[in-house]
Amino acid sequence: MYGLPDRLRPLSAAEEQVMLAVWACREPATRRDIDEKLRGKGWAPATVLNFLYRLEEKGWVKSGKQGNHNIYAATVTQRAYGVWSMRQRLDTLFGGDLAAAVRALGSESGCGQSELEQAMKVLEEKHLEAEEYDLYDPYG
């Protein structure tokens, strides 16, 4: 899965919400910490616990004990998941064509001039990094 360990299985939309809560907590987090981040969802503590159990089975979190409490920590960073998730969407919706995705975002997403300029700056920086890498001679 694009830079993520092969042992990981895809997340459902609800599991993704729980992972966002785990990432938002200081690690390791207790179920109560995670519940607090999910307060607006209206989920019962047992529901959150069930999601955490499934996430552990899928390899997304690991659990342990701290005193009387179970604690949870993500096994993957939010950034790594974000990159993987965006790559999946890019492949699924745009056939892997980054330029088509950028055109669609620029023309139909309501991005303001400031956001577009910021995106251009990032793309230019990445382009320069790629050029530097291409010019690198490990033997010279």
Where are the predicted features?
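Short, cationic-aromatic polyanion-contact patches
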Residues: P10-A14, Q66-S85
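Glycine-centered, phosphate/nucleic-acid-interacting loop/turn motifs that mediate DNA/RNA or nucleotide
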Residues: G59
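Short helix-coil junctions and helix-kink-helix linkers
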Residues: E36-P45
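Short alpha-helical segments that sit at the start of domains
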Residues: M1-M19
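Conserved segment of winged-helix/HTH DNA-binding domains
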Residues: T77-V102
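Short helix-capping/hinge SLiMs at alpha-helix to coil transitions
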Residues: R9, V22-P28, K41
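Short acidic, hydrophobic short linear motifs in intrinsically disordered regions
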Residues: P28-K37
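C-terminal regulatory/oligomerization modules of transcriptional regulators
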Residues: S107-G140
